[in-house]
């Protein structure tokens, strides 16, 4: 990937983006954690940088690993130092954290945990003659300035494995696309890479030393860009660094024999324990020379494995398999095609999911389904991003063939894939819609004492319908939730959280769930969030993100204002308007203007994006309108107010009020008439009552 040509324009856009965000950002704010990674097995100090951190009290860890905060020191409003105890059994790789202060919850950011001791890059090291000598089995913390090239020298004996794994884009802090190479003493490249699918847009390498001697590791930005923010963690050692695992998944809760592929020392066979929880899991292969510093992705699912057997290139040579098993194979050389044959009965429906890029394989899969005689039924390339997906409705009792190959006809020894014929099952996911496309503003629940906070909650139903209810059992002490059940016709609902005046200040991460109104269905789903960590050209494309499955809750200190909706006593009618009165209760001394939003609009209801309650005034009117097809009924409504306080921007919501939408009481029709300019005229209006007035 070449990024230098767009670097100047992108930096300018980035500065504008940060300037815009600054006015909307939630408080407190967490921008960066330094160093970007630490070695497990002891106490480590991390510096959290951001804004409005002076009242920091707690660090939320999204993993279940046994981190222990030994000390939290506030340096100033923009910096805190955290002394962490990181035991030897903490998981390697990325860990997501955020800060709870007495006034709010920050964004979540990442830091890395490694197994190797850390050394710092030392300049000057811009040539082979100046290469920084390092031991094997270390992690180098370095920075690439503009047009900078860093060299590191290591010793190896003939046949020893030299493995290199760089974490740069995966650090999630800056658009730095690294290039790495391994050179011999004569400056010849033994291996080089820009992007490795196993490491996203970072690179991994492993070679066997051809002779005793000194070898050089080169690090630079792929197009010789870089600046002081272009940080990296360079893992160098004798550890295994495969690029794929085969098979790429196993049956949940059962042991599975696998082979790690793509390592210079050859395939590594191991038995692994597949976790009982379904989904993607991380594997860290190890041998007598160490442990792989970053994960190989592996899928835990309800299905056992069927492994391809060559030859299976043609439909008439397809491997016979049971449709209850997952289909595993490798597109091992250019032009390779794999075919599997299975029996199915008319009326069966399968979600045919091909996992390749989602498990970080380099394969860009294309799948097709045929009758066993070769007649085509369906095909797909990219319905799951680069991965393929087909919903297959079996047309008759028969045998069918699934064919898989690479979109460009490529093939490599690590182009693994896994195809699952999944039965149609219901699923449910909750999320909070973004109010700012690239930020985490108001993606957490922070409720001021004696006040309220509200969010819109999205529910993504798949393969089912029906009413949903939320589970409020996970809330912190002193906090309660006010929400109606979500009607089957809706995918979004308002939820108000209230904190008692004496609620203890504190917070937690929790699995926030919803369920079908009928417990017999067993349908449940939980909150998930996906934050953009690195954006870049073109058009603010997302290069790296962070995903979590817990929601952060906190009770925070009191605010100097409260907001209320004056409950409407009459309905809004179709093709009509309503002046919704909003009242502001100010604490003594608080005179700032407050911005009020009306986030939830039932079908057919419109409103402006916001209104202002001017400084030193206590109420305003929000104009609502209903179109001719507005949904009839009684709907929940709320407003949320933002005001500037000495601690930064703050939010409070109103109570959950109701808005009735009704048919007009009368219809009016005007008769055609005419008059001369400057004259008066009478116009006949005919009223037709729709329902009696009360």
What are the residue ranges of the model-derived segments?
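Bacterial N-terminal signal peptides
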Residues: 9-21
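Short glycine/proline/serine/threonine-rich loop/turn segments at secondary-structure transition edges
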Residues: 89-96, 226-229, 278-283, 411-414, ...
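Surface-exposed, proline-enriched loop/turn segments that connect beta strands in immunoglobulin-like
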Residues: 32-35, 245-247, 432, 441-443, ...
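Acidic, Ser/Thr/Pro-rich low-complexity intrinsically disordered segments
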Residues: 24-69, 75-79, 88, 102, ...
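Beta-sandwich strand segments
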Residues: 108-110, 226-231, 411-416, 520-530, ...
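Extracellular/luminal low-complexity segments enriched in Ser/Thr/Pro
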Residues: 82-90, 259, 271-274, 456-460, ...
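Short beta-strand edge segments in extracellular beta-sheet folds
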Residues: 110-118, 233-239, 275-277, 297-305, ...
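Predominantly extracellular/luminal regions of secreted and cell-surface proteins
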Residues: 109-136, 289-324, 427-430
């Amino acid at each position: 990937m070449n990024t230098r040509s767009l670097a100047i324009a992108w930096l300018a856009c980035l500065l504008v983006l940060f300037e815009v965000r600054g006015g909307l950002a939630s408080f407190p704010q967490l921008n960066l954690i330094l160093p970007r990674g630490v070695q497990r097995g002891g106490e480590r100090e991390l510096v959290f940088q951001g804004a409005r951190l002076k009242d920091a009290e707690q660090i939320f860890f999204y993993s279940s690993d046994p981190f222990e905060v030994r000390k939290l020191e506030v340096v100033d409003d923009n910096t805190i130092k955290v002394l962490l105890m990181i035991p030897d059994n903490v998981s390697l790789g990325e860990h997501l954290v955020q800060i709870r202060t007495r006034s709010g919850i920050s964004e979540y950011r990442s830091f890395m945990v490694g197994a190797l001791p850390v050394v710092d890059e030392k300049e000057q090291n811009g040539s082979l003659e100046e290469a920084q000598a390092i031991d094997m089995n270390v992690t180098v913390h370095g920075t690439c300035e503009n047009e900078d090239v860093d060299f590191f020298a290591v010793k190896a004996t003939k046949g020893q494995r030299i493995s290199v794994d760089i974490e740069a884009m995966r650090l999630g802090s800056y658009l730095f696309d690294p290039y790495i190479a391994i050179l011999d003493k004569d400056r010849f490249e033994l291996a080089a890479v820009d992007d490795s699918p196993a490491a996203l847009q970072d690179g991994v390498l492993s070679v066997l030393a051809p002779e005793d001697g000194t070898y050089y590791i080169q690090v630079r930005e792929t197009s010789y860009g870089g600046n002081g923010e272009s940080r990296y963690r360079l893992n160098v050692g004798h550890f295994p660094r495969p690029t794929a695992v085969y098979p790429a998944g196993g049956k949940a809760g059962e042991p599975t024999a696998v082979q790690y592929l793509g390592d210079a020392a050859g395939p590594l066979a191991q038995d692994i324990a597949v976790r009982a929880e379904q989904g993607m899991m991380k594997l860290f292969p190890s041998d007598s020379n160490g442990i792989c510093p970053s994960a190989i992705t592996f899928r835990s699912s309800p299905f056992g494995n069927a492994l391809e057997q060559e030859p299976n290139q043609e439909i008439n040579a397809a491997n016979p398999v049971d449709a209850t098993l997952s289909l595993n194979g490798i597109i091992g050389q250019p032009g390779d095609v794999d075919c599997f044959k299975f029996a199915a009965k008319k009326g069966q429906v399968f979600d045919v999911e091909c996992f390749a890029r989602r498990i970080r394989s380099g394969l860009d899969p294309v799948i097709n389904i045929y009758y066993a005689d070769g007649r085509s039924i369906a095909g797909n390339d990219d319905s799951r991003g680069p991965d393929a997906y087909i919903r297959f409705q079996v047309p008759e009792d028969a045998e069918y063939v699934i064919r898989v190959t690479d979109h460009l006809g490529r093939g490599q020894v690590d182009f693994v894939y896994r195809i699952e014929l999944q039965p149609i099952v219901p699923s449910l996911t909750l999320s909070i819609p973004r109010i700012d496309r690239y930020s985490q503003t108001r993606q957490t629940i922070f409720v001021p004492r004696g006040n309220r906070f509200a969010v819109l909650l999205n529910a993504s139903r798949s393969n089912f319908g029906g009413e949903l209810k939320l589970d409020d059992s996970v809330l912190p002490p002193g906090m309660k939730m006010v929400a109606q059940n979500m009607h089957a016709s809706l995918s979004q609902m308002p939820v108000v959280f209230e904190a008692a005046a004496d609620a203890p200040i504190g917070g937690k991460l929790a699995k926030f769930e919803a369920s079908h109104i009928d417990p017999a269905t067993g349908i449940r789903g939980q909150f998930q969030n996906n934050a953009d960590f690195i954006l870049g050209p073109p058009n603010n494309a997302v290069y790296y993100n962070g995903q979590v499955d817990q929601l952060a809750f906190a009770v925070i200190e009191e605010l100097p204002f409260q907001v209320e909706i004056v409950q409407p006593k009459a309905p809004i009618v179709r093709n009509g308007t309503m002046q919704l009165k909003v009242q502001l209760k100010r604490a003594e001394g608080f005179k700032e203007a407050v911005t009020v939003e009306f986030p939830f609009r039932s079908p057919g209801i419109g409103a402006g994006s916001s209104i202002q309650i001017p400084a030193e005034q206590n109420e305003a009117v929000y104009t609502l309108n209903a179109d001719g097809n507005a949904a009839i009924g009684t709907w929940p409504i709320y407003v949320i107010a933002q005001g500037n306080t000495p601690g930064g921007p703050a939010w409070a919501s109103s109570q959950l009020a109701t808005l009735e939408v009704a048919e007009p009481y009368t219809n009016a029709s005007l008769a055609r008439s005419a008059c001369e300019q400057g004259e008066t005229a009478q116009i006949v209006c005919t009223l037709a009552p729709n329902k009696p007035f009360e």
